[in-house]
Amino acid sequence: MKIYRVAKASEYLVITGILIKDIKLAKKAWILPGQSCSVLDLSPVNYTFEVQAMSAEKLPFVLPAVFTIGPRVDDKESLLKYAKLISPHARHSNHVNELVQGIIEGETRVLAASMTMEEVFRGTKQFKQEVFDKVQLELNQFGLLIYNANVKQLVDVRGHEYFSYLGQKTQMEAKNQARVDVAEAKMKGEIGSKLREGQTLQNAAKIDAETKVIAMQRAGEGEKEGIKVRTEVKVFENQREAEVAQANSELAKKKAAWTKAAQVAEVEAKKAVKLREAELQGEVERMNALTTTEKLKAEFLSKASVQYETKVQEANWELYKKQKEAEAILYEKKAEAEAQKASADATFYASKQAAEAELYAKKKEAEGIVTVGQAQGVYVSKLLNALGNDYTAVRDYLMINGGMFQEIAKINAEAIRGLEPKISIWTNGGEAGGMKEVAGVYKMLPPLFKTVHEQTGMLPPAWMGVLPDKNS
């Protein structure tokens, strides 16, 4: 029948039999008929030995040791080895004890035989570690692990007192060394005492010097702090003065701007009045020009030339208006420049604006001259076409329209004003004598007309006669 077995915390169940190829390790399992189950205790066991060994000088000694040995629980392969090789025997049986003791004694003797007694005695810790490593290497074959190895002090074999003599030697060396150490300590104490006294005096002098230096440093730092504070106060005062000056400057700039705005507004108002007056004056002049044009139309020009004259007059009016606007802009720019001169940092800007305004006025004046020239060219061209390409008639019209004859008459009148000219004719008493002299005056007119024609290019009216022929 089936039996359910459970192992304790430090145990494993070792199961063999049917359905199991080799062995099976488990903490709990059903044990079937035809299967065998044994308990494998994993707790380590202490083994105490006194190993007798011999050094390289053939000196025997005893090595007391206590080894704590048990199965390696962290390796399944080691557990299987232990279950197969060791578990069939009792844990404290002579078989296991002899196995472990034989491994330890064999490795210890081999290692001791390669070392002198002095090396074993002075390198006890290293000797113990090498014994531990070599024994562990052999125990791995059986799945065993050394949990702890406590190798005691080496002991002499009876009849051989090497370690006791070595201990006495060590004691004497230690005693002598102690005496030397006491003498050296006494010497060092006296030297140290004198050294401490000298160092005390040196340190006192050094501290006094450092105290004076620190006091001077503190005084200097205090003076520097005072200077720093005074400097900061002065800097703060300068900053406040600069801010006040800046505020005053800003106020002056604002006042200048306000004054400028007021002056500009006043100038603009005056200029607007002047512009309006100019517009009205222009309108009056335009009406006068239109009236004059109407008169000229009735006397000299055809309907087409009258329309052209009207357009020319309108163009002249537009030109006049633009000139007035240019003058107004120029005046405004000059006013702005004069207002900006109130600010110290605007001199260059005002000069620049005045130059630009003057340039603009010159450009406008040039444009006006060009426009007038173009208009006059168109006017003369139209007038020439209207008069049938008669240059003489055009010239006469322009001279009449330009008032040249009136000006000549005016100049001549001014020249003879107050002379009160009189024509006196003296005759010899003949009846035809007076008329003959009058006829002589009329004979002088053709040469006069010829002179006028040569100077002005104008011909006298037909009713006044014709010019004398050049060949006559």
Curated annotation (Swiss-Prot):
Principal location listed in the UniProt entry: membrane
UniProt KW Cell membrane keyword: yes
UniProt xrefs under Gene3D superfamilies: Band 7 domain (3.30.479.30)
Tissue specificity comment: Very low occasional expression in roots and nodules.
Pfam families: Band_7 (PF01145)
Post-translational modification: May be palmitoylated.
GO CC list: caveola
Alphabetical list of PANTHER family matching this protein: FLOTILLIN-LIKE PROTEIN 1-RELATED, FLOTILLIN-RELATED
Record function comment: May act as a scaffolding protein within caveolar membranes, functionally participating in formation of caveolae or caveolae-like vesicles. May be involved in nodule formation.
Family classification: Belongs to the band 7/mec-2 family. Flotillin subfamily.
Protein name per its UniProtKB record: Flotillin-like protein 6
Organism: Medicago truncatula (Barrel medic)
